[in-house]
Structure formats: structure tokens, C-alpha cells
Amino acid sequence: MIEGLDWIVIVISLAISLGIGWWAARKNSGDTESFFLAGRCMPWWLLGVSMVATTFAADTPTLITDWVRTEGVSKNWLWWSLVFSGMLTTYVFARRWRRSGVMTDVEFYELRYSGLGGQILRAYRALYLGLFFNVFIIAVVSLAAIKILGVLMGLDAWQTILLGAGVTMLYSVVGGLRSVLLVDCFQFAL
């Protein structure tokens, strides 16, 4: 169970995360591109750290540890296979996406594919990612956090969800993508 000094470190790290959100909000110029894309001026290494930090959420290490424990080291190939698509996205597609000036992948598909086929692809991506994939990922991360914080802090499911979602939504809504990237970097360093 977590003791006094642990609580102090947790409260300070949450306060720093919120502080980063407020600082990022002051840096944003108030337009859509500044909020959703951080003005398109973030350094490549910060974007990379954010991507890596995202895979270090409570769910991924827990899942991979379980895979190795139950099925052996060879099960790592399941997630190692994603390295190729990640590298392709980073070094080939990201440059083209940036050059096109779009904000979202659906907007990119709108430029690339027209007609009924393009509409079907955009609708599929919006429904699949918006209603299935993202909801599933958030549920898995939340379940991992509920289990971990239940043991470490004695929090029940609702307390964990309200605390985690509350802090995350606050710094995200206040500071936009700039805030998310900087908080990811801070939490990765922790």
C-alpha cells in the first residue's frame, strides 16, 4: 500500500501535469491548428517520446508480461511486428501527411480518395476507430489502471476513473496537443 512520501510524489506529479496544461494553453494562439496540432511546430523527438510514452501506459507492460509468462518469449513477435508499420508511418507517410496540410487521417483520405469509395472508407474509419477501437483501448487502459490502483492505493473503480480521466481531460482540454505531448514527456521521464 502507498504511504506518505508516495502520496506526496503522486500529488506533485499530478500538479505538474496540470501546470503543464495551463502553461501550454498560454502558448497556444487560440486557433484550431494551434490547439489540435500544437501549431505544427513540435520537435520530432518530442513526438517520438510521446508515441513511446503512450505504449508505456498501464496496459501494455502488463499485457506483454502476461503473454511472455503464459506463451513464452516468442509471443513478443506479435507486437514486434508493429515496428515495421510504425517506421513506415514515421519516415514515409508522416512527411506526406504534413505536406498535405490536413489535421486528421479522415481529412487525408478525403484528399486522396473521392467518390463513393472514399465516402465508405471515411465512414468505416470514423466508425471503426471512433466507436470500436478507441473505446476498446480506453477500456483496456482503464481496467489496467483500476486493477493497479486498487492494489496500490485502495481506490475503487469509480475513484480511479474519475481521478485519471479528470486530470487527463483537464490538461488536454486546457492545453491541447502541446499539453498532451509535454505531459507525455514528463510522465515518461518519471
Label every PLM stretch briefly:
Residues 1-61, 172-175:
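Membrane-interface "cap" regions at the ends of multi-pass membrane proteins
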Residues 34-37, 107-114, 126, 151, ...:
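Short amphipathic alpha-helical coupling elements at transmembrane boundaries
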Residues 10-12, 51, 83, 122-128, ...:
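Transmembrane alpha-helical segments of multi-pass small-molecule transport proteins
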Residues 42-50, 113-119, 187-190:
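Small-residue-rich segments of transmembrane alpha-helices in multi-pass membrane proteins
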Residues 23-27, 54-59, 96-100, 134-141:
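Short helix-coil transition sites and intra-membrane helix breaks within transmembrane domains
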Residues 36-103:
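Membrane-interface helix-loop-helix modules in multi-pass membrane proteins
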Residues 1-9, 69-80, 149-159:
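Interfacial loop-to-helix junctions that mark the boundaries of transmembrane helices
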Residues 112-132:
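Short helix-boundary/re-entrant hairpin motifs in multi-pass inner-membrane proteins
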